[in-house]
Design a protein with these regions (language model features):
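Lumenal/extracellular "mature" regions of secretory-pathway glycan-modifying transferases
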Residues: 1-13, 17-18, 25-87
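Residue-level recognition of conserved structural "scaffold" positions that shape functional pockets
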Residues: 18-21, 142
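Secretory-pathway luminal glycosyltransferase catalytic domains
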Residues: 48-150
Length: 150
């Protein structure tokens, strides 16, 4: 079974195209299953934006409810554990759970709006959740012809 690359979609059509493109490039180069999270950002979008890639011939499936639950559980656990670590200084116990419960799973957030080469060299042995806008064509330039066909 291949590792999964889950890409969080957010914003309008232009942003979604960039997010899909980085996901497609990483999944293509690392033989990963591409999954699009078209749900978590659009629940309470103040601009009423929606998933807009359904008119394209994309090569990805949409995220399931179970996958969303796992991602949110991990995200919330990490937020709470950071607060506990800072306030109480308890980190050995929490690190044990992080390593044993989530070692197969990695959430990557965009650090800045500029190109980050490290993102293209991510581990293909883990399921990965990408969260960011990824607005540089450098992320997907190598598969430009594939994207144009889609």
């Amino acid at each position: 079974m291949h590792s999964k690359l889950i890409v969080k979609l957010m914003g309008g059509l232009g942003n979604q195209l960039f997010q899909y493109a980085i996901g497609r490039a990483i999944s293509e180069n690392n033989n990963m299953e591409l999954v699009l999270d078209n749900k978590t950002s659009y629940k309470n979008d103040k601009y009423k934006r929606v998933y807009s890639l359904n008119n394209f011939k994309i090569k990805a499936r949409l995220i399931s409810r179970e996958e969303i639950k796992r991602i949110l559980w991990k995200h919330n656990f990490e937020r709470v554990s950071r607060v506990i670590e800072r306030r109480l200084g308890i980190n050995t116990f929490i690190n044990y759970f992080r390593i044993n419960l989530f070692s197969h799973y990695l959430i990557i957030k965009e650090k800045s709006l500029s190109f980050d080469r490290e993102i293209l060299n991510i581990s293909k042995n883990k399921d990965i959740y990408l969260n960011g806008y990824w607005g540089s064509e450098k992320y997907f330039y190598d598969i430009k012809s594939i994207l144009q066909e889609e």
